Amino acid sequence: MTQDKKMVSVVMCTYNGGKYIKEQLDSIVRQTYLPCEIIIQDDGSTDDTMDIVRQYAKQYPIIRITQNELGKGINNNFFSAIRKAQGEYVAISDQDDIWKLDKIEVMLQAIGDKMMCVGRSVPFYDEGDKRVNVHYDERKPNCNIVRMMYASMPGHCTLFRRELLEHLPSHLETRPIYTHTWYDVILGQTAAALDSIVLLDRVITMQRRHVDAASYKDVDTKRLRGMGNGAYIVWWGIKNYHRVKPLMAKHFSVRGGFLESIQSDAPIYKDAVRLMRCESKQGLWAFLGLVRWYVKYRHVMFYTYENDPVALVRAVLNPFMQVYNYRYLLNKK
């Protein structure tokens, strides 16, 4: 692959990232396939972040720096930075991760004619001088639109065509989805709605997580596979269905509304729209509709491919299992 064939813009949004940003920038400027530009947009850092990136910009002219006069917040900051990209492809960078040195090269090779390529990341955290890996699921994930309505692919794992922005609905900033979720969820669901995501099943990013965030180290042991855990999740879902389901209906109403605003001819997209309409309602008919769609897409709607009869059993019980997955909505009431 020659360097002049495809132009890639790297977009990084920063805020008080001075502690780790050097490692990330080093991993980008040392890529085997160099980007045409590195757009760094700062949202009002009060530490030494800007001093560091200015030093790098002197050494690497491909770095373009913008500092917001007023804080934009995550979505406004990322979308405004992405829209400045001049490359045919865009790669999102967090300020504290570490990229594999061939990340851009292998993702360009993998994307083909798709809108988005998604790779894998390994989470880690620093403990003194030690670098400790965090548990993560090594199974190959599904990334079709049915699955993506319940999950997301982190921005730092993606490379996408700038053309993808043209498929976002007009006046995106005024739509409920914009304050409901993050930019990478919006981009991922848009690409999935077009049935245009390819999975690169290899690690391309080391994702730094922070030791003071307990949720990053602790594993919900009830989510680990096993008959006992499965029975507990179903029992919890049945017991709390009446409390959580109304909140889930509101949640999926926003996601479903966004999905319907995307123009796509993909057959799976049309079924995903119907599925979200069932998720957005309550009552027996909506429940039965959910079971129907879960059964139809039982092999591809869970994290990874599942064989029968396990997939069939999970599909039938999934309305209750989903209640457990969305129990966090109780804390947002």
Predicted regions and their residues:
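C-terminal subregions of glycosyltransferases and related glycan-biosynthesis enzymes
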Residues: 174-182, 186, 206-333
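Nucleotide-sugar donor-binding/catalytic module of glycosyltransferases
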Residues: 1-221, 320
